[in-house]
Amino acid sequence: MYQTTAELRSAFLEFFRSHGHQVVDSSSLVPGNDPTLLFTNAGMNQFKDVFLGMDKRNYTRATTAQRCVRAGGKHNDLDNVGYTARHHTFFEMLGNFSFGDYFKEEAICFGWSFLTETLKLPKERLCVTIYQTDDEAFEIWNKKIGVAAENIIRIGDNKGAPYASDNFWQMGDTGPCGPCTEIFYDHGDHIWGGRPGSPEEDGDRFIEIWNIVFMQYNRHISGEMLPLPKPSVDTGMGIERIAAIMQGVHSNYEIDIFRALIAKAAEIIGVTDLSNKSLRVIADHIRSCAFLVADGVMPSNEGRGYVLRRIIRRAVRHGNKLGATEAFFYKLVPTLIDVMGDAAKGLAETQVIVEKALKAEEEQFARTLERGLGILDAALSELTGDTLDGETVFKLYDTYGFPMDLTADVCRERNIIVDEAGFEAAMAEQRSRAQAAGNFGADYNAALKIDAETAFCGYTELVGQAKVTAIYQNGESVTAIKAGDEAVLVLDVTPFYAESGGQVGDKGQLVANGIEFTVNDTQKYGQATGHQGVLVAGSLSIGQMVEAKVDKKLRHRTQLNHSVTHLLHAALRQVLGTHVTQKGSLVDPERLRFDFSHFEAVKPAELKKVEELVNTQIRRNHELKVAEMAIDEAKEKGAMALFGEKYDAQVRVVTMGDFSIELCGGTHVGRTGDIGLFKITSEGGIAAGVRRIEAVTGAAAMAYVAQQQAELEEAAALLKGDTHSVVAKLKAQLDKMKQLEKDMAQLKDKLAAAASADLVGDAVVVNGVNVLIKKLDGVEAGSLRGLQDELKQKLKSAIIVLGTAQEGKVNLIAGVSNDLVGKVKAGELVAMVAAQVGGKGGGRPDMAQAGGSQPENLDAALAQVLPWITERLA
């Protein structure tokens, strides 16, 4: 009997393979063919274009075990995860599909056969639902399968509109749609709940295990349902639900996969109560987080990366709640790989990257979590009602980086309501402020709407004849311009490359008899290319012919930098891992900037390896091959496509040997050897999960190396050596400096001890307490604490205030012996003095430090100390 989740997965795929279905691998959690989807959330996602007739496959029957995530957007189960028996951020959807092949009868028979014959589920435990008017499905269930009429439940339009029903599926307001039939399993009368369609249907007794969608109509914009020429079938069965049934448990969190993950999480954190809901949350979240990272998503502050970050942080918060004191989440990855079996193949290949990414995010959040929980606890302790206001929730999010859903989680556990409307209002107000600020210095040319087209000839030509088809000044269309006028010119054809894909627009000239227009930038305006610049000489009107001349030197240098970004991208993926994807770039004649996804600083050894890899490919002098092809063909060849970019059906593919292949519309060198030299000048983080490399090529790289050599020679001269001995001599100087600093510190301690002996005599007695207040000249701030400790030991029961002024700054220290902290607290004392010298400070009751910016007030401030102390000792 099939019982483990892995066995059920294999049995399902084998069943449909034996019935003529092509077994298709699970697609990525990042949809490659649907920009409207945040994550893959159903088995049919990867076949959407097939169902729409836009993609042809060499099979008409398919079966999959699809990885899915529902956390963010329309399908968001995050808030319920861990608190119910069946909500998950990650799940596997088993499915079988027919693309114009079999239809209702075969689909129903396949489902019933697998459940009752292969898995041997008792038929009396099963009931089915159909759409209210789907008599064909009723006949198949009743006559062909033998399900009693009372166990076939018709579901009508129960969502408030025609065809808005649990049993009618629609891709959108228009397009493919059709009725569906669902199979439910009865867990038994010991669990509350009623049959589907009954008032108690929300209970957990009857659980949907299989949904079969019959795509048989095309919904017209008028609402008319037109029959599809080739009806199709889309089915789905959640593996976690069927595993619970086969393993004799009611909750999905009791199946083998979750039992193993919960046990491991409990072991790592050190808890024994395996029924704790926080363990459920952690066990669920490691699945979605690990597989998302494996599919190329990195924690960030936007889009998919932000959802991933929220899930990781929710898991970490629940670990913290259980008592976790160090990073634990990433340690679950090996167990996850073990329990997921064949479904974890891609995860196993990226295990090291996944663990590093999760650990880095967890450690980064630990600091935010501790601070945020403290502030939230304080806010909740002061709450008089049962609602936490939106302003406080927003402040936690905006100032301290504490996600709203985590605030809601904590409040939920304490039966506190979160003012979500107030939070959203505060968010909207912030967006308005940001937009208002962002309007300053806006490029009003970007608002130009140009109804024209410009042909581009700049891949092969840098000079060409063209006709002026439009002229714009200050956003308005004009017919002519004169010398000195700034304008945007549109040509019918141009060799000028318009800014796109990170490559800056070309510069150059448009010339004719007595006419010279300097092009300072080139931008796209829809299908038109705008040449922005100034008319230096002559007059120019629409319809005139000009010679368009691109600045060859600038274009050449830009091409070097653009081509090398492709080599850099490929090298980063080789050295750091395939999770690296381009997040942005800037390519101009002077340098290149390349932003990419990565969870930590790139190590110097890794940077060196990347640089060496790129320069090796440059020396190999690969010919750059450019070809146009269908986007599907390009992807099959392994061409890198950028997430978020929209591509036409025909794309331009740039290949450099066997090292790099990318979709790209930019301009490039003829051979990699033209680049000459590649030199990285900096690497750093620009956002969480996003790194930036800046580099130079060609002559700029040679100049950079020459500058470094000159600086090295200058350093060698200062150290009185040659360039080969700089490191050794510098190390010797640093060692010498450390010894001098050590000697100086010892000398300062001796001086402080001597000074303390002299200062003891300056103490005055107030109500039996030694009080010493002193301004010290020539004493460094770092020596104050040691001096204060020495004085405390000598004076025994004492209150001490010392101050020093150096380079326009005041440093203060207050010390109170332990027997006196009940009457005088050092923190309050030093804060009083600091306030009078333009500063602030604080500390423990027995010792506190402060600073200030008004040394001219130090004497007067210290004069206030004795009366202040006397009052408190009275």
Swiss-Prot record:
Cofactor(s) this protein requires: Zn(2+)
Protein name in the entry: Alanine--tRNA ligase
Main location: cytoplasm
Subcellular location: Cytoplasm
GO function term, MF aspect, one: zinc ion binding
SUPFAM superfamilies documented for this protein: Class II aaRS and biotin synthetases, Putative anticodon-binding domain of alanyl-tRNA synthetase (AlaRS), ThrRS/AlaRS common domain, Translation proteins
Cofactor binding note of this UniProt entry: Binds 1 zinc ion per subunit.
Domain statement: Consists of three domains; the N-terminal catalytic domain, the editing domain and the C-terminal C-Ala domain. The editing domain removes incorrectly charged amino acids, while the C-Ala domain, along with tRNA(Ala), serves as a bridge to cooperatively bring together the editing and aminoacylation centers thus stimulating deacylation of misacylated tRNAs.
